[in-house]
Amino acid sequence: MVIATDDLEVACPKCERAGEIEGTPCPACSGKGVILTAQGYTLLDFIQKHLNK
C-alpha cells in the first residue's frame, strides 16, 4: 500500500503553507503550514497508539 503525502495533509487555507501570518504563528495550523486530513489523523493515531505501549 502506498500513501502519498497529499493523502495525509493539505495546505493551510489561512496562511497558505507559510506557517505564519504577519510574523505570528498561524492559529489554524499551529505554525506548521499544513493541516492533517482524516486519513492523516487515522495514521497518526495508529502510530501513537503502537509507540506508546
UniProtKB/Swiss-Prot annotation:
InterPro entries linked? Anti-TRAP, HSP_DnaJ_Cys-rich_dom_sf
Cellular localization per UniProt: Cytoplasm
Output a single Gene Ontology CC term carried by this record.
cytoplasm
Molecular function terms, GO-annotated: identical protein binding
Q: What induces it?
A: By uncharged Trp tRNA, via the T-box transcription antitermination mechanism.
Q: Which Gene3D superfamilies match?
A: 6.20.20.10
Q: CXXCXGXG motif repeats span which residues?
A: 12-19, 26-33
Q: Which UniProt keywords apply?
A: Cytoplasm, Repeat, Transcription, Transcription regulation
| Ranges annotated as spanning the membrane | none
How does this polypeptide assemble, per the annotation?
Homopentamer or homohexamer.
Task: Please describe what this protein does.
Answer: By forming a complex with tryptophan-activated TRAP, and masking its RNA binding site, it inhibits TRAP's RNA binding ability, thereby abolishing TRAP regulation of gene expression, leading to antitermination and increased trp operon expression. AT acts by competing with messenger RNA for the RNA binding domain of TRAP.
What is the protein's given name?
Answer: Tryptophan RNA-binding attenuator protein inhibitory protein
The lineage, from the top, is: Bacteria, Bacillati, Bacillota, Bacilli, Bacillales
Q: Which gene is annotated as encoding this protein in its UniProt record?
A: rtpA
